[in-house]
Amino acid sequence: MDSKHYQVVPFTGAQLPEAFRQVIIEGNQAFHWNEAQSRDDFQLDQAEYYLLLDHDQVLGYVGLHHVLDEATLNLVYIQADLRGQGLGRQLLDFVLNQLTHRGIRHVFLEVRQANAAALGLYQQAGFETLIVRPRYYQHPVDDAVIMQKMLSLSEKEGEPS
């Protein structure tokens, strides 16, 4: 696929077209979310989704919740056959830039300790570990790593730092 056709489109959960909802519901199964949990999330006022699209095909997405100046990244997903190509980093950078310009100052996330690829992605993006919750996840048992990134605009040109 030609990267010049990729675009990131933001949606609130309620705005998501049903076809995109179905893709997200399927992707969320990788995070052990069932269909009811995904559909409930679509209805939350604070739920937002950033979809990475190639024309009308969803390549990946970020799902988050925001309250005041904080956001929690709940879902960062790239299709399995497209991983390792830098799309996750590009999508994450785009989302963080958007959040910064909207006045979000604290971004949190939680990731399985065993998910080395995701941990590396988040560390490269400037997230730092706050705490590790031992044996937090089940099936399989794994520790949860809670991470945070502080967002701020630099004085130069309003760029995120």
Predicted regions and their residues:
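Short, flexible active-site-adjacent loop segments at beta-strand->alpha-helix junctions, enriched
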Residues: 68, 113-115, 133, 151
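Acetyl-CoA-dependent GNAT
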Residues: 3-6, 10-81, 92-94, 98, ...
